[in-house]
């Protein structure tokens, strides 16, 4: 009888927690026995999530920093890895705007179906796996790791602790390496750069983080759990139940019954310290790019948790040139990395790249006709020659040659291979 999928024993789980450096500083509000009880007799192998989690953890611990771009589609992710990035970021904002399962365009307010982000994680992984297959049959070794780790946005969890557990589970099945969770009220969730944000009590967000960790442990995957706080800008909180939040109450109440709170860096620091035992990385959402604010946050958190890793959002919601000069922009990432901000990302890079790229082409095409597209094609040829761009050969890029290989493996005498005799073979050398 096969032993594949047999879960670890309670003793083996506990030994891993006690001896594996991966779990240094991690607090669990549950026992190894409770994890074992929840596993059943078979645990599905989550190869992509496990592999991605291990790679991501290695990167953020051993590189100066990892910079990432938000991908909106599978092909965008492929281009990012082809160009030299080592990790993919997937934002809920972009999924809301153009990639959710309801097929609608939404603002970043958790209006889309909760399984939409896992669906896009799976799509991106499928695209990366195909790129890896194509590269292998072509003998292309220029990319070290095609199936790069994906950090995905769980927003505010779409509900309570059980919703968070199920969403983390879905992220793992889809192959996410890391997942971030924000401390907003899910039913009133807003983009970090919109108004009207409502915080949940510190203890409630710890419950969310605990649910995510439990789901990962039950799946036997070392998922990278990221805690985000929106306390820098939020002006409301649902309850005064947690004494850690009370010093920031401003004495006001709203028509909905929410409590007014004083925002800023101090509540962010307080929350980050509370989340640190439960999170592998911590992200403070900010309204402007400011090295001094980042330094204060890092020094305050790491004075108590010296090994705590941090994350930073290079948000397109900032007008970068209005805040920083070119020299500061050029050194910003390196200096953040030295402060412990090991995962740095541009959340909406895919949205802006996709929309501006198409607008620019359409603007030229509307006025110049085919000249505009030929200009684009010539830039593609130049990028292929000088920088390793491959999508100029679009049939090859999506796997026509790979599926020809399948066809000729099945029947070496086939006369219906796709690339042979194609215009791409004839004109794109």
Swiss-Prot record:
Active-site residues annotated for this sequence: 191
EC numbers for this chain: 4.1.3.1
The keyword Transmembrane helix is annotated on this UniProt entry: no
GO MF term list: isocitrate lyase activity; metal ion binding
Catalysed reaction equations from the record: D-threo-isocitrate = glyoxylate + succinate
Summary of subunit composition and partner proteins: Homotetramer.
One GO biological process term: tricarboxylic acid cycle
Pathway linked to the protein: Carbohydrate metabolism; glyoxylate cycle; (S)-malate from isocitrate: step 1/2
First-tier enzyme category under EC: lyase
Gene3D superfamilies per UniProt: Phosphoenolpyruvate-binding domains
UniProt-recorded name of the protein: Isocitrate lyase
InterPro entries registered for this protein in UniProt: ICL/PEPM, Isocitrate_lyase, Isocitrate_lyase_ph_CS, Pyrv/PenolPyrv_kinase-like_dom, Pyrv_kinase-like_dom_sf
């Amino acid at each position: 009888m096969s032993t594949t999928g047999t879960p670890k024993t309670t003793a083996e789980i506990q030994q891993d927690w006690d001896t594996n450096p991966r779990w240094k500083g991690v607090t669990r509000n549950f026992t190894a026995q409770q994890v074992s009880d929840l596993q059943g007799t078979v645990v599905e192998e989550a190869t992509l999530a496990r592999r991605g989690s291990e790679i991501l953890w290695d990167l953020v611990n051993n590189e100066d920093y990892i910079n990432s771009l938000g991908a909106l589609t599978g092909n965008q992710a492929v281009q990012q890895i082809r160009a030299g990035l080592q990790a993919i970021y997937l934002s809920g904002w972009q999924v809301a705007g153009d990639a959710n399962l309801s097929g609608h365009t939404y603002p970043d307010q958790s209006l889309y179906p909760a399984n939409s982000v896992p669906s896009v994680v799976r799509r991106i992984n499928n695209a990366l796996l195909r790129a890896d297959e194509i590269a292998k049959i072509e003998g292309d070794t220029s990319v070290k790791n095609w199936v790069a780790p994906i950090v995905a946005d769980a927003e505010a969890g779409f509900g309570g602790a059980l919703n968070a557990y199920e969403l983390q589970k879905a992220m793992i099945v889809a192959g996410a390496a890391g997942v971030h969770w924000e401390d907003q009220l899910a039913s009133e969730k807003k983009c970090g750069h919109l108004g009207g944000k409502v915080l949940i009590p510190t203890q409630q967000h710890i419950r969310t983080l605990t649910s995510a960790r439990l789901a990962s442990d039950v799946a036997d995957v070392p998922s990278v759990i990221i805690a985000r706080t929106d306390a820098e800008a939020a002006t409301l909180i649902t309850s005064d139940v947690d004494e850690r939040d009370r010093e920031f109450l401003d004495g006001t109440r709203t028509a909905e019954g929410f409590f007014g709170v004083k925002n800023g860096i101090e509540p962010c620091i307080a929350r980050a310290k509370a989340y640190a035992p439960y999170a592998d990385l911590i992200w403070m959402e900010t309204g402007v790019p400011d090295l001094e604010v980042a330094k204060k946050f890092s020094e305050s958190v790491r004075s108590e948790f010296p090994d705590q890793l941090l994350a930073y959002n290079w948000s397109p919601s900032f007008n970068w040139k209005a805040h920083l000069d070119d020299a500061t922009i050029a050194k910003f990432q390196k200096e953040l990395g030295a402060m412990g901000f090991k995962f740095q990302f541009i959340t909406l890079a895919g949205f802006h790249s996709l929309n501006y790229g198409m607008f620019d082409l359409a603007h030229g095409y509307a006025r110049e006709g085919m000249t505009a597209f030929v200009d684009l094609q010539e830039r593609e040829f130049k990028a292929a020659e000088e920088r390793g761009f491959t999508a100029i050969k679009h049939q090859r890029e999506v796997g026509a040659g790979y599926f020809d290989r399948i066809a000729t493996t099945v029947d070496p005498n086939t006369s219906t291979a796709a690339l042979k005799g194609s215009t791409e073979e004839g004109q794109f050398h």
